[in-house]
Amino acid sequence: MSDLEQLERQILEDIAAAVDEQGIEAVRVAALGKKGTVSEKLKTLGGMSPEERQMQGPAINGLKNRVTEALSERRTELRKAAVAARLEREKVDVTLPVRESAASRGRIHPISQVIDEITAIFADMGFSIAEGPDIETDYYNFTALNFPEGHPAREMHDTFFFNPDEKGERKLLRTHTSPVQVHTMEKFAAMRDKEGRDEPIRIVIPGKTYRMDSDATHSPMFHQVEGLVVDKSANVVNMKWVLEEFCKAFFEVPSVKMRMRPSFFPFTEPSVEVDIQCDRSGPHVKFGEGNDWLEILGCGMVHPNVLRMSGYDPEVYQGFAWGMGIDRIAMLKYGMPDLRAFFDADVRWIEHYGFRPLDIPTLFGGLSA
């Protein structure tokens, strides 16, 4: 066996014996490094005669190429083995039950839970979710909703205003989610006019709203959900059916009596407030039974002025809308006495009233089962 054959055999044995990338790198340096055994052989070619170089050159270069290829193959094998070992170490048996300690580390906030419940119910009735900015213009928050400048109903909204900008326009924190109704109607009206797609509107709008209130039942920031339907045939009967189905599903009762009382909202005409049947004789309110009534939401047919300003002819289209405080109905359903506790970030309160993240109720299985 020649010296080159012996050297190649030794190097290949060292490569096969390497158990990690550090070992492979050590073999590479020993063989192909600046002072490596194969590199030293290559250096000898410079001192050979042309005849010797012609004989030895191909053999030494062939050795270098075979060693390089063997190093590459072994490095690839080791990398694959390392990945497989890591996957084996980190393998998770997804059929195992969740440990109680892991499941109890966090809770779904009641507000998030109730928003999910509300949107699930309306989604089952064919509604889509719409959203809009918290910072609004005076036009979208008031004027487009039939609150003209100087209208006394503006005083009912204790509004947070920003300082005027360089154009003199003063923006505000929206006092209700109703501006999203106007944005949506404008969008659908533009789509109708440009593309000829005259589609009905069926949306629910959950979100934050802001007013300067703070007591046990009011907060400067609170959550509201509104709904809007606009179509050529929308009517009060449709509205009553939608709201009755919602109340039955949300409060999980087979039937519920509703009472509508005349009211006033600038953006609807006629406007009504809805009370639902309940029993308040015990420590918790029971819905769908008893002789008591509890106000739950406000609603009405969209005012012709609002339709007109949003791009709809009130002689052709009709709509109905409703709105309710998410925080308030969460308090009613789950027996929470103080609205301010929703925003105190008290871990004990969350542990008591929150929902398990891996046991989230569904509409199909019962909202609060």
Curated annotation (Swiss-Prot):
Reactions catalysed according to its record: tRNA(Phe) + L-phenylalanine + ATP = L-phenylalanyl-tRNA(Phe) + AMP + diphosphate + H(+)
Pfam families, alphabetized: Phe_tRNA-synt_N, tRNA-synt_2d
Keywords: Aminoacyl-tRNA synthetase, ATP-binding, Cytoplasm, Ligase, Magnesium, Metal-binding, Nucleotide-binding, Protein biosynthesis
A GO MF term: magnesium ion binding
E.C. number: 6.1.1.20
Entries under CDD domains matching the protein: PheRS_alpha_core (cd00496)
Main location: cytoplasm
Cofactor note: Binds 2 magnesium ions per tetramer.
Record's keyword annotation contains Lyase: no
Any one Gene Ontology cellular component term annotated for this protein: cytoplasm
A Gene Ontology BP annotation from the UniProt entry: phenylalanyl-tRNA aminoacylation
Annotated positions binding Mg(2+): E269
Protein location: Cytoplasm
Cofactors that this protein relies on: Mg(2+)
HAMAP family from the UniProt entry: Phe_tRNA_synth_alpha1
Subunit structure, interactors included: Tetramer of two alpha and two beta subunits.
NCBIfam families registered for this protein in UniProt: pheS
Name of protein: Phenylalanine--tRNA ligase alpha subunit
Organism phylogeny: Bacteria, Pseudomonadati, Pseudomonadota, Alphaproteobacteria, Hyphomicrobiales
